[in-house]
């Protein structure tokens, strides 16, 4: 799509340079034939290093645009990105015309649905009522329990177990808001990648990325009823206990443990070997190799001292 057509669609001033744009992506992931966006000056460093061919940007930030990147001046870059995402959204069905490739040793229940272009590896089992979407790749020795739904283009490694009722690759909860309070859907054009030896409990929801990937790295084990939002990256051999919620763009190192009902606020990083106790709330990036508890989050030993102090104060007041 011509950049000038994008400008016309968004009702923005025409660009100074014409170029062909094939997609929309983040500043970090964009290529010279993709467009990105900048809403705030705190992303200036990412913009300077971006390879994006064009960028939606406020007039006040034009001086930050690197050479080779064509600006489209917008009063509301994030909102215009949401509107633009619809133009580049893949259709939910019919994009792939190829017949699915199912390995001879795979077992597929008669009531399971396998979409066009899907690939099912050797010895993989897909049970009753499961839906494998178009373009999904399932590795070898996987076990997909009843009524699992795996949306299009999801990539799953070897020896992955997904228990009943889980949904992989649905759209994340992403909206931009107009001045009148309307909510404009951000179409999610990324994918989900689940690496080797991952096990997902029942009724998990793992959302596809807005751009790029949501990724669950190898060896990670996730309990029942867990929500992992768009663009999260969960490190190798991590443990996630029931009812955890990870907000969008949460990333973790390896061997991180999330206790039951703990949560993150998104756009933050949890370091290697960190442990979040049950109901802990992570609101900013934290170091690894420590145990944390409470909300506001603090080191577990400090939380224990606080609880003891509160108990002491209550006794004094009685």
Curated annotation (Swiss-Prot):
Cystine residue pairs: none
A GO-annotated cellular component: membrane
Top EC class of this enzyme: transferase
Alphabetical keyword list: Acyltransferase, Lipid A biosynthesis, Lipid biosynthesis, Lipid metabolism, Repeat, Transferase
A family per Pfam: LpxD
Molecular functions per Gene Ontology: N-acyltransferase activity
Summary of the function given for this chain in its UniProt record: Catalyzes the N-acylation of UDP-3-O-acylglucosamine using 3-hydroxyacyl-ACP as the acyl donor. Is involved in the biosynthesis of lipid A, a phosphorylated glycolipid that anchors the lipopolysaccharide to the outer membrane of the cell.
Protein name: UDP-3-O-acylglucosamine N-acyltransferase
Native organism: Wolinella succinogenes (strain ATCC 29543 / DSM 1740 / CCUG 13145 / JCM 31913 / LMG 7466 / NCTC 11488 / FDC 602W) (Vibrio succinogenes)
Lineage: Bacteria, Pseudomonadati, Campylobacterota, Epsilonproteobacteria, Campylobacterales
Gene for this chain: lpxD
């Amino acid at each position: 799509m011509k950049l000038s057509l994008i400008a016309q669609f968004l009702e923005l001033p025409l660009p100074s340079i014409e170029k062909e744009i094939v997609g929309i992506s983040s500043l970090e992931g964009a290529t010279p034939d993709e467009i990105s966006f900048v809403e705030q000056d705190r992303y200036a460093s990412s913009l300077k290093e971006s390879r994006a061919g064009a960028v939606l940007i406020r007039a006040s930030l034009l001086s930050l645009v690197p050479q080779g990147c064509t600006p489209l001046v917008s009063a509301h870059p994030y909102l215009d990105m949401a509107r633009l995402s619809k133009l580049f959204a893949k259709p939910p069905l019919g994009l792939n015309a190829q017949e699915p490739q199912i390995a001879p040793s795979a077992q597929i229940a008669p009531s399971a649905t396998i979409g066009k272009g899907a690939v099912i590896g050797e010895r993989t089992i897909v049970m009753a009522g499961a839906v494998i979407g178009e373009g999904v790749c399932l590795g070898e020795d996987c076990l997909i329990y009843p009524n699992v739904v795996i949306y299009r283009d999801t990539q799953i490694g070897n020896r992955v177990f997904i228990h009943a009722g889980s949904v992989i690759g649905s759209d994340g909860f992403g909206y931009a808001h107009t001045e009148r309070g309307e909510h404009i859907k951000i179409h999610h054009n990324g994918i989900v990648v689940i690496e080797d030896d991952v096990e997902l409990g029942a009724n998990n929801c793992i959302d596809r990325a807005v751009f790029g990937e949501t990724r669950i790295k190898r060896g990670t084990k996730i309990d029942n009823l867990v929500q992992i939002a768009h663009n999260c990256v969960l490190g190798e051999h991590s443990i996630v206990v029931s009812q955890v919620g990870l907000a969008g763009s949460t990333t973790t190192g390896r061997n991180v443990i999330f206790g039951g009902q703990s949560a993150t606020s998104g756009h933050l990083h949890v370091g290697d070997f960190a442990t979040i106790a049950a109901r802990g709330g992570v609101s900013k990036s934290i170091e690894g190799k420590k145990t944390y508890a409470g909300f506001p989050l603090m080191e577990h030993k400090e939380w224990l001292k606080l609880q003891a102090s509160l108990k002491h104060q209550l006794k004094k007041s009685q």
